């Protein structure tokens, strides 16, 4: 079941790739993918290329995939291990969601962080109190790690 669904998503991605994103299996292992997200233009991540790993559980799509950044990023909802705080990867997961939709949600999280549900409270505090400083540091990290 999982493998069939993963193959279908791979075909859908090839036919209709989401804007600014790409994803596909690493080698022959269909349960382990690598994804790429281009830093959105209207964000301090503009110009960056961010890599993520995707691990599908054997009971996919009934359980969410594990998605994590491998490129370092300065963001209140993404910690230094690359873990992403995003409701659809946890409690709000639904089998109707696809990797394409997950990647688009991560893209929109880059444009619009959620400082009220942070993984990194210190970055959330800076985002809320000094947006200029947040944008500057996020741009610096993007230049340092994602270009």
UniProtKB/Swiss-Prot annotation:
Its EC number is 2.3.2.23, 2.3.2.24. Changing residue 64 to A: Abolishes histone H3 ubiquitination and decreases interaction with PHF7. Pfam families: UQ_con (PF00179). SUPFAM superfamilies: UBC-like. Keywords: ATP-binding, Nucleotide-binding, Transferase, Ubl conjugation pathway. It catalyses: S-ubiquitinyl-[E1 ubiquitin-activating enzyme]-L-cysteine + [E2 ubiquitin-conjugating enzyme]-L-cysteine = [E1 ubiquitin-activating enzyme]-L-cysteine + S-ubiquitinyl-[E2 ubiquitin-conjugating enzyme]-L-cysteine; S-ubiquitinyl-[E1 ubiquitin-activating enzyme]-L-cysteine + [acceptor protein]-L-lysine = [E1 ubiquitin-activating enzyme]-L-cysteine + N(6)-monoubiquitinyl-[acceptor protein]-L-lysine. GO terms for biological process: protein autoubiquitination; protein K48-linked ubiquitination; protein modification process; protein polyubiquitination; protein ubiquitination; ubiquitin-dependent protein catabolic process. PANTHER family: UBIQUITIN-CONJUGATING ENZYME E2. This is Ubiquitin-conjugating enzyme E2 D2. It comes from Homo sapiens.
């Amino acid at each position: 079941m999982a493998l069939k669904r993963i193959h279908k998503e791979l075909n859908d991605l090839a036919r209709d790739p989401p804007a600014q994103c790409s994803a596909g299996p690493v080698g022959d292992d269909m349960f382990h993918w690598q994804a790429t997200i281009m830093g959105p233009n209207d964000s301090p991540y503009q110009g960056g290329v961010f890599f993520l790993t995707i691990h599908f559980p054997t009971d996919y799509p009934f359980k969410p995939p594990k998605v994590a950044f491998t490129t370092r990023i300065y963001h209140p909802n993404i910690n230094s291990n690359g873990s992403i705080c995003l409701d659809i990867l946890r409690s709000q997961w639904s089998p109707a969601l696809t990797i394409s939709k997950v990647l688009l949600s991560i893209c929109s999280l880059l444009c619009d962080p959620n400082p009220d549900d942070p993984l990194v409270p210190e970055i959330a505090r800076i985002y809320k109190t000094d947006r200029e400083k947040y944008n500057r540091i996020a741009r610096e990290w993007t230049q340092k790690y994602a270009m």
